[in-house]
C-alpha cells in the first residue's frame, strides 16, 4: 500500500487521500538467468591411462604462451591440447601435447585399454540399432541425426532440411585409416612426434599412442628383457611431445585412430633415439636437437577391364613375340 498526497485549489494542502496502488517489484519482472545444473566442460581431453601408483604414468602441462592456464589434478582430470586441429601436415611448433614419461607401471594397461575400446564398440552397436529403428520413418529430425554420429557442423551440405525423400545421417560406418608418422624432433630427454591421417575419408574421434623402449641385443646367455609399454589414450591432436626420456636411448612408437565405428590398425612401429648428453662439448643452455622428416610413399593402382584384356590377347595373336 502507498500513500499519495494531492494538492487542490490554490495550492493549499488538502486532507491526504489514500489511494491503493499495486506496487510491482521491478526486479521480479526481470528475466531470471536459468542456471545450467549440467554444466559440462567441453574441452576435449587428452588423457593417459593411469594406474593407482605413487608415480603417475603420464602428466601433461600446457605451453607457457597459452592464454589460459588450466591447473587440474593429474589423477582425476583430462587435459586438452592446444593443437586440436587435424591438419594433413602437422607442425611441431603449434603447441604440441606434452607428456611426461616416468617409470613404467604394471602390465594391465592393455586390459584398461581394451575396456575403453569395448565401450566404444558397444556405443557403436547401439547407434547402429537406433539407425535401423529410425530408418522406418521417412522424415528424421535434426536432433536425431546429431545424436547418432559425428557431424561436421562446418559442412553446409549436412545442414539441409528433410523433404519427402529419406534423409541419410552422417554416421561413421568404417574405422579410420592407419596414421602415418611423418616427423620427429629429439633432444637428450624430449621427443616431438607428428603424424598425418587420410583426410576426407573416415572421421577420427581421437588417437591412441603406444610408446615402448626398444630392446637392445644382450649377451647370448642372457635372454632379452621385454620392456613395459606406455599407453596414451584420447589424444585429439596429431602431435605429441614426450618428456623425461632417457638420453641416448632408442624408443619405438606406434599410433592408431579411433571413432564411433571402432579402432583402426596400428601403424608400423616408428623407431627414434634420443641424443646423448655431453656437457663438455655443448653447454646446457644450448642443447642438441635433431629433426627428421619423411614423406609417405604414393601408390598407384592400375585396373584393366575384360575388354582391355581381350585386346591385349588379340595383339599377342596378331603380333606374336
From Swiss-Prot:
SUPFAM superfamilies: Fibronectin type III. Residues 175-277 form the Fibronectin type-III domain. InterPro entries: FN3_dom, FN3_sf, Ig-like_fold. PROSITE patterns: FN3. It comes from the Eukaryota. This is Fibronectin type III domain-containing protein 8. It comes from Mus musculus. The gene is Fndc8.
Amino acid at each position: 500500500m502507498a500513500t499519495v498526497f494531492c494538492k487542490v485549489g490554490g495550492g493549499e494542502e488538502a486532507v491526504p487521500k489514500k489511494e491503493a496502488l499495486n506496487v510491482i517489484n521491478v526486479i521480479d519482472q526481470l528475466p531470471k538467468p536459468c542456471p545450467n545444473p549440467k554444466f559440462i566442460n567441453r574441452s576435449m581431453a587428452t588423457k593417459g591411462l593411469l594406474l593407482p601408483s605413487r608415480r603417475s604414468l603420464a602428466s601433461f602441462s600446457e605451453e607457457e604462451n597459452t592464454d589460459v592456464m588450466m591447473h587440474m589434478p593429474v589423477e582425476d582430470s583430462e587435459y586438452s591440447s592446444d593443437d586440436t586441429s587435424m591438419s594433413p601436415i602437422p607442425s611441431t611448433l603449434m603447441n604440441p601435447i606434452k607428456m611426461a614419461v616416468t617409470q613404467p607401471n604394471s602390465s594391465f594397461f592393455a586390459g584398461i585399454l581394451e575396456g575403453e575400446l569395448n565401450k566404444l564398440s558397444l556405443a557403436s552397436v547401439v547407434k547402429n540399432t537406433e539407425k535401423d529403428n529410425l530408418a522406418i520413418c521417412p522424415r528424421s529430425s535434426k536432433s536425431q541425426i546429431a545424436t547418432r554420429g559425428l557431424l561436421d557442423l562446418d559442412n553446409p551440405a549436412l545442414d539441409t532440411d528433410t523433404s519427402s525423400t529419406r534423409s541419410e545421417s552422417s554416421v561413421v560406418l568404417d574405422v579410420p585409416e592407419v596414421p602415418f608418422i611423418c616427423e620427429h624432433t629429439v633432444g637428450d630427454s624430449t621427443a616431438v612426434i607428428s603424424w598425418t591421417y587420410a583426410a576426407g575419408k573416415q572421421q577420427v574421434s581421437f588417437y591412441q599412442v603406444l610408446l615402448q623402449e626398444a630392446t637392445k641385443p644382450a649377451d647370448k646367455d642372457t635372454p632379452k628383457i621385454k620392456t613395459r609399454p606406455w599407453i596414451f589414450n584420447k589424444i585429439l591432436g596429431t602431435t605429441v611431445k614426450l618428456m623425461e626420456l632417457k638420453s641416448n636411448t632408442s624408443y619405438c612408437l606406434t599410433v592408431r585412430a579411433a571413432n564411433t565405428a571402432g579402432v583402426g590398425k596400428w601403424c608400423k612401429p616408428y623407431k627414434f633415439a634420443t641424443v646423448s648428453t655431453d656437457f663438455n662439448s655443448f653447454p646446457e643452455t644450448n642443447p642438441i636437437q635433431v629433426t627428421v622428416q619423411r614423406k609417405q610413399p604414393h601408390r598407384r593402382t592400375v585396373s584393366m577391364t575384360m575388354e582391355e584384356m581381350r585386346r591385349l590377347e588379340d595383339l599377342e595373336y596378331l603380333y606374336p613375340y
